[in-house]
Design a protein with these regions (language model features):
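Single conserved hydrophobic/aromatic residue that forms the stacking wall/gate
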Residues: 1-7, 12
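Short acidic, glycine/serine/threonine-rich loops at helix termini
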Residues: 17-24, 90-99, 121-132, 202-204, ...
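Beta-sheet entry/capping signal
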Residues: 8-9, 79-82, 108-111, 187-190, ...
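Long, well-ordered, tryptophan-enriched scaffold segments
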Residues: 116-262
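Non-catalytic terminal/interface segments that mediate subunit docking, oligomerization
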Residues: 8-9, 213, 221-320
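Thiamine diphosphate
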Residues: 43-114, 282-321
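A glycine-rich helix N-cap at a beta->alpha junction
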Residues: 28-38, 104-121, 139-142, 301
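N-terminal structural subdomain of ketosynthase/condensing enzymes
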Residues: 16-40, 136-154
Length: 321
């Protein structure tokens, strides 16, 4: 969940593979998730470039806020702590706990949402596109900041005028962009941005750096973009092991993997015990539970990436003897 940049820290989750390749572990990448090989997540004991150890999901905002606060306490006002989260993390409660705390903090934290599906809220027409593009311009953010500071120093009418302009602007912007959720939490919202357009992405990130408050950057992407097997079966390529590049077929036959054997055995147990249920935190394929889900759909529960909820939910199930 952490990437150590030059003077900054980036807390990430499922972008760790790309990060490992870019930070000198290309040769070791063939040992990914193997005994004595490199980890599938960021680990500080593996590389000086890994800022923080990771788990499944939803933890990066909390970690980034801690890092941003530590930088602030040390007197560092220049650099940023960046949390990169996927839309799957939105089912995890810790994400919202972190956002709730971070949005009201006086820290240099940037949260980047990598959204693989459709837009969080449908934006309306050309005006929405224009406003979104304006908000991703660094020059706009810096000019806006200078004007606000000038109005703050203007006697008598300065602050009331600034508040009136801001309220009018927010009313129009929220009506068109529907960005109130994140801004109500205290973030400056930028986006949505096309994550496959590098120029637009760079422009948005530069604009985020120019904002002197917590920033939420909404980036839309297509999972597996450019690789047909992954685009066709994104679920099967989540946390994937080694595979044949041309076809996308795994090197290890799925039926022979530990997860598949466990999943099939669980089905046999489910036949004998009608009270047996299976619960997963958005990892049906990774845990081999797709077989159980198909055979016993009424006893299979995918609660999303919400491990705390999953454990207590299981306890509630088990309590009804």
């Amino acid at each position: 969940i952490g990437v150590r940049l030059v003077g900054s820290e980036m807390c990430i989750r499922d972008r760790a593979y790309t990060h490992k390749i870019l930070t000198g572990r290309l040769k070791e990448f063939k040992t990914l998730r193997q005994e004595n090989g490199i980890s599938g997540f960021c680990r500080p004991d593996e590389s000086v470039h890994d800022a923080f150890i990771s788990g499944h999901s939803s933890t990066s905002v909390s970690a980034a806020l801690g890092i941003a606060t530590a930088m602030k306490l040390s007197g560092d006002k220049t650099h940023h702590a960046i949390a990169v989260v996927g839309d799957g993390a939105s089912t995890g409660g810790e994400l919202y706990e972190g956002l709730n705390n971070a949005g009201k903090s006086d820290t240099n934290i940037i949260v980047i949402l990598n959204y693989n599906e459709m837009s969080i809220s449908k934006n309306v027409g050309g005006m929405a596109k224009y406003l979104s593009s304006m908000r991703t311009k660094e020059s706009y953010q810096r000019t806006k900041g200078r004007v606000e500071r000038m109005l703050d120093k203007t006697p008598v009418i300065g602050k009331p005028l600034k508040n009136a302009v801001r309220n009018s602007k927010n009313a129009v912007k929220n009506m068109i962009l529907h960005s109130t959720m994140f801004e109500d939490l205290g973030f400056h919202y930028i986006g949505p941005i096309d994550g496959h357009n590098l120029e637009e992405l760079e422009q948005g990130l530069m604009a985020a750096k120019a904002v002197n408050k917590p920033v939420f950057v909404h980036v839309n992407t297509i999972k597996g973009k450019g690789y047909a097997p992954a685009e066709a079966n994104p679920g099967e390529f989540h946390g994937v092991g080694s595979f044949e590049i041309k076809t996308g077929n795994p090197d290890v036959v799925l039926s022979d993997s530990f997860s598949s054997i466990m999943g099939k055995e669980l089905c046999e147990m489910g036949e004998k015990n009608k009270r047996l249920c299976a619960v997963t935190a958005a990892m049906k394929y990774g845990t081999g539970l797709q077989y159980f889900a198909k055979r016993f759909p009424e006893r299979f529960f995918d609660v999303g990436i919400a491990e705390e909820h999953a454990v207590t939910f299981c306890a509630g199930l088990a309590s009804m003897n």
